[in-house]
């Protein structure tokens, strides 16, 4: 048979089969105030929670989403059945916001500020509060503030959550403060980025998701109280300085990019990796979290749609998938053979566990392709076949 170049393989690590969706599995999407223009395009019905980001105070404690009106977003999300939280602080405080937080978290100012937070929540019909003070701003004032805010949230019957780094606990977060959160959104992304231009590579690999999960479980947070953060963006290490790229922009270059995690020096999470992480969260955790909704592609290539369909067990009809293709042997031996007896061209790529592409291919109808696998390291691989806008992933094992 005629040999061709092969198309696509994706690394797809999972701890086990996904559980059926439970009523308390959360799909949380952050929406920054500077993305409110996408309000009409976001499918809020695919979310359980929307976190509006970020509200910050002035020196008097008055909160604002940088002057943006959240009402249309709150109404749209509520109409779709999603709860809406206000997320406080964020990772990019202006000097004015930083000064206000330092001032308002002082013991003598704390109670009055928390009262203003509760008024802001009530006035805007928020369903909870997410606290996202980060890095150098997490100091000795953090835990006492969280505990007092927790008391006020309890008095109103509202949940309190936090966004925390994937594998780092700030030293000033006490055991009591950590236990005060209803759940923790693990930011399992930004392993590298624009601040580290000499370290190009995946910023949110599957291995980082696993490490984040194990880390926070080791910190005593129960699995149901952890959500796995996934990125809807990537980093382009081919520019100087290193720039970020929306997922929508990446698939706008070429729709086939939706099935990859790397294009040239741009690293991101495509549909197969997002699906794998969603399956991991379903089987091990309490939910999945998205940063952020405004960077999605609002089409059939939507990452939010891929998450929702994975959570709800939606698959495409069998006759829509390129099921005529065969890949064997599995476990892998000396070579992987992919046969395409069907009428459509198949496309794909081969990646190793670090996201490095191993091969790319087009398999013409009625042909096969053989890829040598004898020297591949032991591990899990995924053959992803794409045809006519649909794709099928086949997990492969190299013993």
Locate each region found by the language model:
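Short, well-ordered coil/turn segments that N-cap beta-strands
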Residues: 25, 48, 80-84, 125-127, ...
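Low-complexity, Pro/Thr/Ser/Gly/Ala-rich linker/spacer regions in secreted
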Residues: 21-23, 308-324
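Extracellular low-complexity, Gly/Ser/Thr-rich intrinsically disordered linkers
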Residues: 254-310
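Bacterial Sec-dependent N-terminal signal peptides
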Residues: 1-22
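C-terminal outer-membrane/trafficking sorting elements
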Residues: 320-328, 332-399
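Glycan-recognition patch characteristic of GH18 chitinases/ENGases
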Residues: 21-121, 200-207, 214
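Conserved, mostly hydrophobic/aromatic
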Residues: 50, 86, 131, 184, ...
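Substrate-binding surface in catalytic domains of secreted glycosidases
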Residues: 28, 59-69, 115, 135-257, ...
């Amino acid at each position: 048979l005629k040999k061709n170049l092969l198309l696509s393989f994706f690394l797809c690590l999972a701890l086990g089969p996904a559980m059926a969706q439970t009523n308390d599995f959360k799909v949380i999407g952050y929406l920054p105030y500077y993305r409110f223009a996408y309000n009409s395009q976001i499918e809020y019905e695919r979310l359980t929670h929307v976190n509006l980001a970020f509200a910050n105070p002035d020196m008097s404690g008055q909160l604002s989403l940088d002057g943006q009106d959240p009402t249309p977003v709150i109404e749209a999300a509520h109409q779709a059945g999603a709860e809406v939280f206000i997320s406080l602080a964020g990772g990019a405080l202006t000097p004015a916001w930083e000064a206000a937080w330092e001032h308002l978290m002082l013991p003598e100012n704390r109670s009055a500020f928390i009262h203003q937070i509760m008024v802001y929540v009530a006035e805007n019909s928020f369903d909870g509060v997410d606290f996202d003070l980060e890095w150098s701003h997490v100091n000795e004032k953090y835990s006492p503030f969280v505990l007092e805010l927790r008391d006020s949230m309890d008095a109103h019957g509202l949940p309190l959550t936090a966004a925390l780094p994937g594998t780092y606990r700030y030293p000033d977060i006490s055991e009591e403060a950590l236990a005060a959160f209803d759940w923790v959104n693990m930011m399992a992304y930004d392993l590298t980025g624009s601040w580290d231009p000499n370290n190009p590579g995946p910023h949110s690999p599957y291995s980082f998701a696993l490490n984040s999960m194990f880390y926070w479980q080791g910190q005593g947070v129960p699995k149901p109280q952890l959500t796995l953060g996934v990125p809807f963006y990537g980093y382009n290490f081919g520019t100087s300085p290193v720039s970020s790229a929306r997922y929508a922009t990446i698939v706008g270059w070429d729709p086939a990019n939706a099935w990859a995690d790397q294009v040239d020096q741009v690293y991101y999470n495509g549909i197969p990796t997002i699906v794998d992480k969603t399956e991991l969260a379903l089987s091990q955790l309490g939910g999945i979290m998205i940063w952020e909704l405004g960077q999605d592609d609002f089409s059939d290539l939507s990452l939010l749609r891929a998450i929702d369909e994975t959570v709800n067990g939606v698959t495409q009809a069998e006759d829509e998938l390129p099921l005529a293709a065969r890949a064997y042997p599995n476990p892998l031996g000396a070579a992987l053979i992919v046969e395409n007896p069907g009428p459509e061209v198949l496309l794909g790529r081969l990646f190793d566990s670090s996201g490095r592409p191993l091969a790319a291919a087009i398999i013409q109808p009625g042909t096969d392709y053989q890829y040598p696998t004898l020297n591949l390291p032991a591990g899990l691989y995924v053959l992803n076949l794409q045809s006519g806008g649909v794709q099928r992933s086949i997990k492969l094992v190299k013993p």
